[in-house]
Amino acid sequence: MNYEQAMEYIHAVQWAGHKPGLTRTRTLLAALGDPHKQLRFVHVAGTNGKGSTAAMMASCLQAAGYRVGLYTSPFINRFNERIQINGVQIPDEELVKLVEQVKPAADAMEDVPTEFEIITALGMLYFAQQKCEIVVLEVGLGGTLDSTNVIDAPECAVITALGMDHVKELGPTLADIAAAKAGIIKEGCPVVSYGGVPEADIVIRRVCAEKHAELTEVDFSRLKYEGGSLDAVEFDFDGLTDVHLPLIGSYQPRNAALAITALRVMRTHGWNIPESAIRTGLETVSWPGRFELLRHAPAFLLDGSHNAHGMRATVQSLKDRFPGQKFVFLVSIMADKDVDQMLSLLAPLAVRFVTVTAHTPRAMPAEVLAEHIRAYGCRAEAADSIEAGVARAVELGGEGPVCALGTLYFSGDVRNAFAELVKG
C-alpha cells in the first residue's frame, strides 16, 4: 500500500456518513489491542475555539518537556496535520503502516465504522506506538457520542466557547448543545469551562456535580487585553504578563486564558508545567487558517469561522485590526449552516463578495450563495473555481483588504491558489 492508496481507503465511500455512538470505535480499538488505554488525555469539546485551544495546550505541554500528541480536525493542507506529535505531522510512511494495521479490523466489522472513527483509531494507535506522555484530543462533533469519547477519565476535560451549531445533531437549544459537550466529563476528572452562557453553564455545573468533577470556570476579569497588531496580540492573564500571541484574532486571548487555566489546573494534579513553559508555548504556537494573514499589504486574510458564533468574533477582529476599512470577501459556506445570520454580520463590512463552492458535498453552490448575498443589497459574483475566486477577489480588492472565510474546508485550496497567484 502507498500513501495515495491509504488516503483512498480512509476516504472510501463505505465509511461515509455521521453515525453517533461509541460501540463501533470500541470494537475497532479492541481489535487493535485498546491502544487508548495506554495513553493519558486532555479532552477538548466546544463550539468554537477547540482547535486553537488544543494547539495552545499542546504547544505549552511540549515546552514543558512532554511528548505530546495532538489530534484535530479538519485539516487545512494535508490530511497528516490531523495527527501530530510535538508539532510534527505523522509521516506518510507511518500513516501507511497504520492503515495496513487498521484495515483488517475495520473490514471485518459488520456495523461498518465511519471515516472519523477510523481516523480516531489511527490516531490512538500512532500515539500509543510512539509512546506519547499526553495527548490533546479534540472532539469531532458534540461530545457524548463522539468517537473520541471512548477514553477513560482525562487528565482535564476542557469546554471551549459554546454557541448554536450542529443543531440537527445536538439539539435546538444551548442547553442541548451544552449537554452534548458535557458528555466528555467523566467521574472525578478536572473540568475547565470557558463559560459565559448562563443556560449552558447551568448544564455543565450540574453534570460536574453529578460526576464529582472539580469545575473551574475561566475568570476573564483577570484578562487584560489592549488590542494588537497584524503580527501578534499582547495580553496579561492572572499574573502572566505581556504575552505575545502570534494568533492575531481578537478572540484568541480568551482562548489562551482558557488554555492557561486548564494547564494550571493540571499542574495542581501533578503535571510539571512551569509558567515559563506556558509563556513559551503560547508565544511559539502555530495554528493555520484562523484569522491568518497571508499577506500584509494589501492585506489578504484567511479565517475558518464557519457559524454565526464564530463569524461574530471574526467580524470584531476585522474591525479591531482594520478600523474603518471595508473588505472584499471571498466566501464559501456549508448549506447546513445559519447562512443568513453569517451574511448579516459580514454585509456591513463588505465592498463586494466573491463566492466559490468548497470541495465538499455540504457546500452551498457559489451561485446560490451569491443570490443570498444580493438579498442583503450587496454586490456578489460567483466564481467557477476557488483559483478563479481568489484571483477575482484580489483584483477587486486592489489596494484594500481581502478576507477569505466561511468554512475551514476551502482554507487549503485558498492558501495554495493565493501562493500561486502571488508567485505569478
PLM-predicted stretches and their roles:
Residues V44, S52-G69:
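A conserved segment at the C-terminal end of the G1
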